[in-house]
Amino acid sequence: MATTCEDRFLLNDWHVVAECSQLNMKKTINTQLFGKQITIAEEPNSDIKVYTEDKVLPVKLKYGFIWTSLGSPTRQIIDIPEALDKDRHVISGGATQVNTSGLRVVENFLDQGHLSWVHPGFLGEQPHTEIPDYNVEIVNDEIFVSNVELYQPKASTASTEGFLVAYEWRVYRPLTVALYKANSIQKDKMDYIVLFIQPIDEENCIVHSFLCYLSDNTTKEEVRWYMQVIFMQDKPILENQIPKKLPLISRAETPIRSDKISIVYRRWLNEKLINYGAITNS
């Protein structure tokens, strides 16, 4: 049975619930957010309305997505300067339903250790499984991960050979996480991937991806295809994790390098009193 979200930090935030282009195909979309049924409709004057059975919700359109909130948003939608770069393919990477907590998806996205095992031939390969030390810090209430280099045989569709790829992560909100990754051609510049995770309920979510890739030697279709291939490799791993909720309960923390991001992320969630989609001490 779906439970009610009482986490003010989550409720008073903006969440993606659909792509704007979906309303070009049908005038009404039914979906869920935090266990609540919501309807997205295009009005006769072309305005977009989002509502539950008992109230109209706030709505914003940004980056080609429809955003709403069940509460009273206290923060703006995140700023993405890369979305304004004319030298980039700026596109949706698609929406995928995953039968696990949205918090699990964020933690998996941050996990360096799985790349060689889950994405061989793309994001890693044996024997290149060593995780060098890296930096994790919290700045302005966001998590930043830097000083990461990982060998990848095919870091993107534009890759012609394997190389050490510079990585950075940024966790903006509990359900919004981005990756900056060295471009395969212009290695001194970064491609950008962000996941906007829509919690259907505590154990199911829809992952909306937004891609800002430098356009050298690649097409929009290739960029989207690559993202979908990688994510479909992750999906069964995520859906087979037990429990589906992310454990935040106190436990002994083994100081393994690849776990450092996870430990910081879980502590950060605890500090924000996040319970929805998590197993906590409370």
Explain the meaning of each model-derived region:
Residues 74-282:
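C-terminal catalytic domain of Rieske-type non-heme iron oxygenases
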Residues 1-2, 282:
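Short, Lys/Arg-enriched, disordered terminal segments
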Residues 2-90:
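Rieske [2Fe-2S] iron-sulfur-binding domain
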